[in-house]
Amino acid sequence: MTLPDLTWPAAWHRPAFRGQLGAVVVLLLLLTSQLPRYFAWVQARPGRTLPDPLLAALPAHDVSGLTFAVIYLGIGLGVTVLLPRPLRLLRALWAYLGLHLLRCLTLYLLPLEPPPGLVLLRDPLVDQLIYAAPAPITKDLFFSGHTATLLLLALAVPVGWRRWGLLAGTVAIGTLVLVQHAHYTYDVLAAPLFVGLAWWLSGAAVGRTLFRAKAQP
């Protein structure tokens, strides 16, 4: 679906836009409030260790600093581009909600143990606000949320250098979490499939009526 770029005043005049924006913000806040308890349960469950020939051949290194520099620069770029474009922002928020729900489902269905040689990936912000628990969360594996987030932003921004930059960041993050042994190779390779599904579903959630507007130059 091609997204026109309405201004905020034009979008805000549409009751459907206001309703959907309010709904997705409330749902994201509700989900965020439940994630600490859910991830603590995920961490407490026993799981399987998967064979991973690539990780077995790849020495583990702590690249947390570089990983989160790329992630937060990418998020900053994506948010900066999306904030002046309310319809793109709305679809991105619905897709992000869908992505988290899909990830909660896959974590429920596929309990896994961390890859051998895991080097703990430390994110002070998320560890304190989302994954807050007595012990670090290491079993939130299938699929890679870090990789998926940047790829989702790449889909949400307009075509151009910013999309290419976010795609490059996605590849970098997928590589870095493997170097860290924070994810299995399967987690990284599966992320684009779930991003594509969440993005497609977000188009249906927002509805075509919101996009019947003349695109800005």
Regions found by a protein language model. Name each.
Residues 30-34, 100-106, 170-181:
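Aromatic-anchored segments of alpha-helical transmembrane domains
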Residues 42-50, 83-163, 209-215:
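Membrane-interface loops
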Residues 190-217:
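C-terminal membrane module of polytopic membrane proteins
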